């Protein structure tokens, strides 16, 4: 099986002494947008040699976010450039920016067929007809387009399956299988991706398409435990510069999010069933979610709420003087457990006094 691995999305959570990028560094170009984002007041596109290189979000809208923090996203074309890491590190060093963690990374494998010639459409059809059973996350969607084809005097409707995904926008990680050739043809063509396919020996024609299995990992999914060793594994910038580490990360998440077994009768323990081999048997880690960083932990949500509302709960007591400290602890706890967005949504409601 021939496939090409790549990073298709990379966003870094960073900090600097000033909390802003220095737009007087003349090696790069800077374009300030007329609007910011939901979480940051300013959005700046950084250009390199006249092409969009980075998108920088700066100046937090809320005190919940870390002061002087920035989010730096690498523009898609540069992710496929061999000199991407050199250019990115040069920018970070010149602006004295420190990377704290990865906000999001998408790692993809592009191929024509799975291991042993299994066609992606065959996999999708077998799953939808219950011939195959998915192991793991139950939320998912199938994607298709339908068309009519004339047969004699009549026309017949057909379905063309274009994708299958597991997970949701709220998930720490999700997997998405889709027809990348079809997307480039119908949404936006990207010649640099087609060049990657050509260099990798993939076929991209009208009859033979390139498919992509995309693993999208958010900040709360960057840390996990390897069941076999008991050790914690943390996805960071350094690991993403190593092609072997990238492959390990991809196959680890692909195994935990996009695995199938034959759906036979009498299955009592799915973990003992042989899995359908999709790739070439590359090394992977036996991923286990760390409880301490689980965004769905009810106890953590209750504790964050109690800390945030401390001044209202204990009004009239000396403890109210420590309201700022309590909120700071709540913010740090939310950040450590992947609940920052949840806290941002709740804080306005919590800041409304419940008693007069």
How would you name each of these model-derived features?
Residues 295-303, 307-309, 313:
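Helix-turn-helix DNA-binding segment
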